[in-house]
């Protein structure tokens, strides 16, 4: 979710204010790397506002930074219900309204309201051409328009996939405070380790809505602890 989507509470209405330094040093580096180093073809707008404007229509975030500074020429798309306007969204650089909480498709911001905005001169055809170009560019790069170049059947749940997800999870962990130098654990002085709480035995990959997956391979925290240190210390579990 681009960008500064840092809380779930009131995430569709909250107006985030942060300093330029915090924006550049904390919230944007991962997106910048995904675009410039990873070659991301699509970026999804966050639900929240940033400095008074929703992220789907935020000219500073999308037009100035994402497109002009980083050189992103792919598709900028909303999450479901993240669009709030027609003209500001077009001007900021939103390409695709993925879904909107409006009953009729023809009433979505990029449906009849967009047609009327073009007819009335509020939106120039050059902006429409820009959006079409972004979508076609991604379709060409992913071989959607050329069946002969489409990727063949892929693979699922390979050892390489499992290792990649393991590495991503391990490298994403950030230790905020190591009080009294508790870590790393000194097993020469520890006889047993208590793991307390239901989440230690639960698998966590299954979220809701679009984040729901059926993981074939997943390691619970308790399983991981026992696999890593089970031969050094007695690891005991309690539901709590």
Question: What do these predicted regions represent?
Answer:
Residues 1-240:
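Glycoside hydrolase catalytic-domain context in secreted enzymes
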């Amino acid at each position: 979710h681009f960008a500064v989507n840092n809380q779930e509470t009131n995430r569709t209405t909250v107006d985030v204010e942060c300093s330029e330094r915090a924006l550049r040093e904390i919230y944007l580096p991962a997106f910048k790397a995904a675009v410039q180093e990873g070659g991301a073809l699509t970026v999804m707008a966050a639900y929240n506002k940033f400095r008074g404007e929703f992220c789907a229509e935020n000219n500073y975030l999308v037009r100035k930074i994402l497109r002009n500074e980083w050189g992103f020429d792919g598709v900028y798309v909303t999450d479901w219900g993240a669009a709030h306007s027609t003209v500001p969204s077009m001007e900021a650089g939103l390409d695709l309204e993925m879904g909107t909480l409006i009953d009729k498709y023809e009433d979505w911001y990029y449906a009849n309201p967009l047609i009327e905005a073009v007819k009335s001169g509020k939106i120039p055809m050059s902006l429409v051409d820009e959006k079409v170009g972004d979508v076609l560019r991604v379709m060409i790069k992913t071989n959607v328009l050329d069946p002969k170049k489409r990727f063949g059947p892929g693979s699922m749940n390979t050892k390489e996939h499992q290792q990649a997800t393991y590495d991503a999870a391990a490298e994403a962990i950030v230790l905020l405070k190591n009080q009294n130098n508790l870590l790393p654990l000194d097993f020469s002085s520890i006889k047993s380790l208590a793991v307390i709480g239901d989440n230690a035995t639960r698998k966590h990959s299954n979220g809701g809505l679009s984040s729901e997956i059926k993981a074939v391979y997943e390691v619970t925290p308790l399983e991981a602890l026992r696999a890593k240190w089970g031969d050094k210390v007695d690891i005991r579990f309690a539901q709590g």
